[in-house]
Each structure stands twice: as structure tokens, then as C-alpha cells.
């Protein structure tokens, strides 16, 4: 049976994550307050950030940037795509 959480991003009850997706306190907070649907939204947004900013994930500064953007995405004012980003046409 899946667990439900009140998703901080979607502001409604939804299926919770199966395990903490990130280490430490941030991972615990994500596990307790973020739904699977919202996590998938973050994964898509994170891919945009990695591609548009050409981030290398072995670089500690890139990982720190993504962590800050993740906190903003879920718990802050929101993370916005780079200005140069144009979504693919449907």
C-alpha cells in the first residue's frame, strides 16, 4: 500500500515517495513533504537546468547549485528555467 503526503509543491494529498531521494535532512524533508508527481516535475526541471547551464555533476559547485534550486523549487519561491530556454513545440 502506498503512502500519501500533503505535497508542499502541489498543495494536496498525493502518493508519497518510496524512499528519501536525497541524503541528509533535505532528503528527509523531501520524503515527508513531496509527492511522486512533484518529484517527477523536479526531475524534468533539473534536466533543463543541467542541459541549459551545461552542468557537470562531478563538479561540487554544480551539485550545490542544483541543491539550492531544488530547495527553491519545493520550499521557496520556485526555480525558474534559464532565460534562454524555450520549451519544445508540442
Curated annotation (Swiss-Prot):
The record ties this protein, via SUPFAM superfamilies, to:
YggX-like (SSF111148)
Q: Name one GO cellular component term.
A: cytosol
Q: Which domain of life is it from?
A: Bacteria
Under Gene Ontology molecular function, one entry of this record is: iron ion binding
One Pfam entry name = Iron_traffic
Q: Which UniProt keywords apply?
A: Iron
Keyword Iron on entry:
yes
One GO biological process term is: cellular response to oxidative stress
Q: Which InterPro entries does the record cross-reference, listed alphabetically?
A: Fe_traffick_prot_YggX (IPR007457), Fe_traffick_prot_YggX_sf (IPR036766)
Tell me yes or no: is Iron among this UniProt entry's keywords: yes
Q: Which family does it belong to?
A: Belongs to the Fe(2+)-trafficking protein family.
Q: Which PANTHER family match?
A: FE(2+)-TRAFFICKING PROTEIN-RELATED
The job of this chain, per UniProt, is described as: Could be a mediator in iron transactions between iron acquisition and iron-requiring processes, such as synthesis and/or repair of Fe-S clusters in biosynthetic enzymes.
Name of the featured protein: Probable Fe(2+)-trafficking protein
The record lists the organism as Nitrosococcus oceani (strain ATCC 19707 / BCRC 17464 / JCM 30415 / NCIMB 11848 / C-107)
